[in-house]
């Protein structure tokens, strides 16, 4: 059994939580959270190749790693949500637009919010 505590030493820890067929049956898009550098990558997979379409900076404090963890998208595909597990002192839930990949709302959560 793999425990997340054993993965804390990895340089980049990727969480892939969502695959969406946005344009057509041959193109799939994934939001991938990178805990150790406070980014989320939007990847495109066409069945053969994976391409990073955009790297989204999700950190709030420039000198602190906030650690993006939980990531999901709403059923209509209009918004995606991300938890930042580390904070000052609590983590946050951020709401993004899938059209612009910009934050449109946020709320403070308790200590170390990881999954949704």
Q: What is the predicted role of each segment?
A:
Residues 25-116:
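Predominantly soluble domains enriched in secretory-pathway, periplasmic, or organellar proteins
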Residues 6-16:
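Sec-dependent signal peptide recognition
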Residues 19-20:
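N-terminal signal peptide c-region/cleavage motif recognized by signal peptidases
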